Amino acid sequence: MIPTYMNIMLAFTISLLGMLTYRSHLVASLLCLEGMMMSLFIMATLMASNTHFPLINIMPIILLVFAACEAAVGLALLISISNTYGLDYIHNLNLLQC
């Protein structure tokens, strides 16, 4: 396997382990989730550049749009929780139910 792909998979794995380790705080979880999305974006970009199929070039852009939407929703949720409770613990998410 090419060392570049191994490094990207290692970055994804480290972000996944960080997500599992620091799952009690929303900020740490969002950062790890963003690291996972960025490693997936880089992997998709490398795959699209290696395969010369013209329709696959749009896939990294779609993934980047989903990552931006995920970041916006996560930050909005973080602001809502921190304004209401002053903490960023994930267990406060159950308190946001109507």
Swiss-Prot record:
Q: How does it assemble?
A: Core subunit of respiratory chain NADH dehydrogenase (Complex I) which is composed of 45 different subunits.
GO MF, one term, reads: NADH dehydrogenase (ubiquinone) activity
- Name the membrane topology term: Multi-pass membrane protein
Reaction equation(s) it catalyzes: a ubiquinone + NADH + 5 H(+)(in) = a ubiquinol + NAD(+) + 4 H(+)(out)
Q: Does the keyword Transmembrane apply?
A: yes
Location in the cell reads:
Mitochondrion inner membrane
Q: What protein name is recorded for this chain? A: NADH-ubiquinone oxidoreductase chain 4L
What are the annotated GO cellular component locations? mitochondrial inner membrane; respiratory chain complex I
Residues that span the membrane, as ranges: 26-46, 61-81
| Name of the coding gene | MT-ND4L
Keyword tags: Electron transport, Membrane, Mitochondrion, Mitochondrion inner membrane, NAD, Respiratory chain, Translocase, Transmembrane, Transmembrane helix, Transport, Ubiquinone
What biological-process GO terms show up in the record?
ATP synthesis coupled electron transport
Name the EC number(s). Answer: 7.1.1.2
Give the primary localization class: mitochondrion
A Pfam family this chain is assigned to: Oxidored_q2
Query: What is this protein for, i.e. what is its function?
Result: Core subunit of the mitochondrial membrane respiratory chain NADH dehydrogenase (Complex I) which catalyzes electron transfer from NADH through the respiratory chain, using ubiquinone as an electron acceptor. Part of the enzyme membrane arm which is embedded in the lipid bilayer and involved in proton translocation.
Q: Does the keyword Cytoplasm apply?
A: no
Q: Which family does it belong to?
A: Belongs to the complex I subunit 4L family.
